[in-house]
Every structure is written in C-alpha cells, then in structure tokens.
Amino acid sequence: MAVLLIIIAQPYFFLMTITGTHFNYYHICHRKLWLFSNGINMEQESDLVYEGTLLHEYAYPQRNSKYEEVVIDGIKVDYYDSKNKIIHEIKKSNKIDKAHEWQLKYYLYVFEKHGISGVKGLLEYPLLRKTSEVILTDADREKIKYISDDIETIISLQSCPPLVQKGICKKCSYYEFCYTNESDI
C-alpha cells in the first residue's frame, strides 16, 4: 500500500520570528527590512557595522561578566541586568534614535510577554556620552501589535519595496546594493 505524502511548503518568512532588528529596520527603511528578511544580508561587509560591533565589545568591558545575555523568542539582548531589571542597548549614533527606541520597546514587550515584568530599557550612546531611559506604555503595546502586522505584510511582499532616497542611505550597509542597479530587483 502506497502512502501519498503531501508537503505544503511555505516561504520561510511565514516561519520567521520578528526580532528587534525587524523593528529597527521598519523605522529606518522598508526596503532594508524586506531585503534583510528575505535573506539578503549586507551587514557582514559593512565597515560601519564592524565599528558598531567593536564599540559594543569595548565601550563597557566590565559588563561581559556583570550582566547576562538573554535570548527569548528570537531576540538577543546582549546586556540584561537581572538584579535591577534593565536592558542595556548600546548604539553608535543617535541619528536614528526612533528606530533604536522601538527596537528596545520591542525587547521590553517580549520580556513582558514571557512573564518578566517591570523591566526598563536604557539606550546608551557611549561616543556621545548620552543615555536615555525607555519604558513601555499601553499605547506602545498597541502600536507594537500594529507594527508587527505591518512588518509581516512588508516581508511577505513578492518583490522588494521601491527605493526611497533618504539622508541616511549613504551610511547604510545596503547602499551599494540599492544604488548599483535598482531596476534588477
């Protein structure tokens, strides 16, 4: 007796967990969000991303032993102070502060969703010597649900969103990809 096995393959983005990076890219550029979510990753080639990685590793060297790295639901929080319930997010520049803030709010939301309540966030810009506190409000929780749905809509598009020229494009790791031959995408 033969058994017919039917496998319905879904594109991997339906299986993808939304991460803080998705929230960050959503606020920066929908095209970057789509490219990243569809497996086109240019960060490994970017000197600017490398500089950010170095800053992250060396700005607060004492943190590696003091705070914990936490992975929940596909998000990776590098510095979590469990004693004081604070997520520390380190960024190089505050030029896209809104994107950084929503990335951190999403982390707070995921922690809360997993029963870790009362967590605060700190956005830290060591090169600017600036720190700002981030909290999650009821309005933010509602907006996160809306943004999550919008992210899923964007990443499930059959083709890449059109290029939208912005002032931050030249510092983006996808710059050459986007501006080399836009009609091929």
Residue spans for each PLM region:
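Short helix-capping/linker segments at secondary-structure and domain boundaries
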Residues: 36-42, 111-118, 180-184
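Active-site metal-binding core of divalent-cation-utilizing nuclease and nuclease-like domains
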Residues: 46-84, 102, 129-133
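Solvent-exposed, charged helical/coil patches
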Residues: 13-64
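Cysteine-cluster motifs in flexible loop/terminal segments that predominantly coordinate metals
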Residues: 29-33, 160-185
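Structural motif
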Residues: 20-23, 99, 160-167
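Targeting/processing segments of secretory and organellar proteins
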Residues: 2-4, 9-10
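Nucleic-acid nuclease catalytic cores
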Residues: 72, 81-157, 167-170, 176
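Short alpha-helical "patches" and their helix-cap loops
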Residues: 42-53, 120-127, 185
